[in-house]
Amino acid sequence: MFNKTITTLSVLLCTLMAAGQSLPITKSVGGLETKVWKSPAKVGSQTLPTSVDNSTSIHFPPIFNQIGGSCAQASSIGYVFTYEMNALLDRDASIPENRFSYLYAWNLINDGADEGSFQYQGLQIASSNGIMTEADFPEQTSALYFKWASGFEKYLNAIKYKAETFVNIEITDSASLYKVKEYLYNKGEAGKKGGVLGFSSQATGWKFNTSYSGPSETGYKCVLTKLAYDGGHAMTIVGYDDLIEFERPDGKISKGAFIAVNSYGTDYWYHDNGRFYLPYWFFISEHDSGQLSNDLLGVIPKYVEHPQIVFKVGLDYTSRNDLMFRYGISNNLNASSPEHNYKFPIFDNQGGDFNMQGRGAQTHLEFAMDFSQYASRTGETPIWYLTVERTQKGSKLGEGIMRIFEVYDYRKNPENPVIYKHKDINGKTIELGTNVFEISSVEPPQTSFSTIEWLNKSKQPIASPYVFRTADGKYAKVRFSEYDRENGTIKIKYVYAPDGSTNIE
């Protein structure tokens, strides 16, 4: 179940998260702002309870058994993001409509293979385009389909549920241990809900006491007694119990443990209903960071009732990792290229050599791209741009066509957006290289005209000139001559009056 590739991912994640501690306030990891969490309460001003267990909250989802090597997303999205979003919205996580799909995130970042990932990668997706609920992206029975969801409304719903940022807490001593417990209890604000935190460790060769009967306020029977030596894994800390007693290797007794939740289901023999006690001692004693990361990861969620600007895209394609998307605008209606152009952070040469919806699935995909973060740069009458880059990335070069490109502008009326449509995109081939599609928010001016007879009975141009009114309201004089019907050529002479005068010589 575990392998050295995942171990490397875990160690790299630990390194990245630890690097974030060198800055006292913020750190950008993978393009997502990370905050070193600081309690709003005065240091030591709170009396913490003896125990906290947020896994018993209605906001925490039922324990589940992860699919494949998806542990990082199972923790960061399936548990942490789900709990925090439901705590924010005061919702019950027992129903699929309120649980967030870790597989939706994992399938976007695993390159079409059963491989591990970083916790922040799923949160980066949550930050940019939101996370689907399990109602829109149901649980899978196999890790090998690598499914992508299709449907504009599903993606539009996902855009409501975002990660604003995520937080780091590093455990190094008793003071930072108190800080973690405070976060779990009420995040430093009296009367507020506590949080949960993701962490990484190894998980091959660990040892447990599965019949713990010592002091406890929370009542679980499983205590970790020895750290693992291989196989990186991600899990979630949901609470603590200060009464737990743990016999250290030197025979001394240490008190207190975190409550950890795993994603191996409720019947995993080393745990108690999917949970185990993780003694504080392991964090504050000397150990290898690959065995257990001292850095814990939390999420600050954001609910967006209505987006501002959303692109709707539909296409058929047979090897999805060939494709990369950009979306942009120009506020100059005479522009021939985007003034502002941004790389879309998902569907970015990802997903492996499969059809758009996954292995053995349909080639068609319809999705939404949230442009709201760039709305402040968008004027009232822009040109909208969609760029599709097609390059061979895997073992085969796919092929396909565009179906839909539309822009939904919710800025004036969130309930009734203005919809701009590309009217002739359906069926256009996605060529190798750069494919640019544009929609003007202003209809081109309409020009009316009357038919004229410009050939005489001999089928030659009439010698006299004609005066036309041009599309800009000015005038031009035109004469036709030297018409060659067989070769399809004609000579045209014209004089344009830029001052609008009809006095044309």
Report the location of each language-model feature.
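A short glycine/serine-rich beta->alpha loop
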Residues: 57-68, 109-113
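N-terminal signal peptide c-region/cleavage motif recognized by signal peptidases
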Residues: 14-15, 19
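Sec-dependent signal peptide recognition
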Residues: 2-11
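Alpha-helical support elements that line or immediately flank enzyme active sites
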Residues: 64-89
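N-terminal zymogen propeptides
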Residues: 20-55, 310, 403-409, 424, ...
